[in-house]
Each structure stands twice: as structure tokens, then as C-alpha cells.
């Protein structure tokens, strides 16, 4: 995705650090009935009630100068605004430059953009990796932080995003104990999300 080129990784590693961007991707797919039902179960009935706050490193913006992800992020956060209404974020066009990216759903592109902009720090001696721009994300519903969600709820957000937004018929999912540390009431929801996935 760097240097104007669209790139979808053949292998995508998603762990618990991705749950915020997974929730944002689901919010961007709020008009999909199954996703809307899931958001309602989280207490989200109107995405306009959600505020998303980004903590960013301004000095690193230049590293992403000619990138679709940064151009979209700059439109979402005009004039350095870092507190954004979720409806604004969900309705801001992604405007991808490549024809291949234009075929992707907005929610998938938003996940990929935020994934790229918020990846872990580059380690010493690792070439060709860009330092992250977004240090942290806080999502609030009427001033109540989603950071207080249980581990099981965060895992369910990840599974829902993987199965409803990121995956397709050609995807193979490898899950490492997805129900570990999950309340018994959430295990059924996890199983249903996995079983309804159309990939493998």
C-alpha cells in the first residue's frame, strides 16, 4: 500500500491489539443487517452516539506522504482534529487510487488503512517498515469507553470483523484458542460467528 500501490497481504495476523480498528471497521459496515444486529447487541443503536479519539505522532505524517491511508486519515481528521464522530468517519469516502482497491468494501479498506497506520514500532535493524502514526485509539459511546469491554467481547469483535468484513470465500482462518478466557455466555456467539463464515 506504500507509494500509491494497493496491496492486500496474503497473510494477515490479527491479535487482540487490533480490536479497536476491528470495531471501527464494523461501524463502517453498520448498514449491513448482520453487522447492525451485532452492533445493537453491543449497545450501539446509533453510530452518531460514538466518538473515536486518535492519539497520533504528528512528526510521522511525512512518512506516509503519498499513501491512500494517510490521505483518507487526513480527510477524517481535518485541521488536526483527533476526536471524530463515528458517523463522520463511516461516511467519509476512502477514495482509493487503484482499480483493485476500488472493488473492496469501505469497511475493509478502513480496516486496512488503520492497520497500516497503527502497526507496532519498527525494531532496530528492520528495513522497509514505516513507524506507526496512530499510537492509540479510544472509542466511546455517550462518554462510556469501549476499553472496559470484557476479553470475550473484544474477541467477538475480532471474529465478527474477520468473518463479516475481512474474509471471503477464498479465505482460510487459523484461530488459536478463540474461546480462551471467554465467558460461557459468549462462547455460543463466537461459535455462531465462526460457523456462519463462508470461507474455510
Question: Where are the model-predicted features located?
Answer:
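Active-site catalytic pocket residues across diverse enzymes, especially alpha/beta-hydrolases
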Residues: 163, 194, 198
Amino acid at each position: 500500500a506504500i507509494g500509491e500501490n494497493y496491496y492486500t497481504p496474503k497473510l494477515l495476523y490479527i491479535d487482540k491489539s487490533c480490536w479497536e480498528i476491528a470495531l471501527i471497521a464494523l461501524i463502517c459496515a453498520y448498514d449491513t443487517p448482520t453487522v447492525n444486529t451485532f452492533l445493537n447487541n453491543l449497545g450501539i443503536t446509533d453510530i452518531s452516539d460514538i466518538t473515536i479519539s486518535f492519539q497520533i505522532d504528528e512528526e510521522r505524517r511525512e512518512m506516509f506522504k503519498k499513501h491512500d491511508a494517510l490521505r483518507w486519515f487526513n480527510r477524517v481528521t481535518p485541521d488536526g482534529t483527533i476526536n471524530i464522530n463515528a458517523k463522520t468517519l463511516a461516511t467519509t469516502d476512502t477514495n482509493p487510487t487503484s482499480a483493485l482497491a476500488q472493488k473492496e468494501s469501505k469497511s475493509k479498506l478502513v480496516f486496512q488503512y488503520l492497520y497500516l497506520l497503527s502497526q507496532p514500532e519498527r525494531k532496530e535493524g528492520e528495513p522497509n517498515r514505516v513507524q506507526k502514526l496512530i499510537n492509540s485509539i479510544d472509542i466511546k459511546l455517550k462518554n462510556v469507553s469501549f476499553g472496559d469491554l470484557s476479553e470475550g467481547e473484544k474477541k467477538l469483535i475480532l471474529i465478527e470483523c474477520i468473518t463479516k468484513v475481512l474474509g471471503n470465500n477464498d479465505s482460510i482462518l487459523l484461530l488459536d484458542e478463540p474461546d480462551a478466557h471467554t465467558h460461557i455466555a459468549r462462547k455460543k456467539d463466537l461459535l455462531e460467528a465462526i460457523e456462519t463464515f463462508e470461507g474455510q
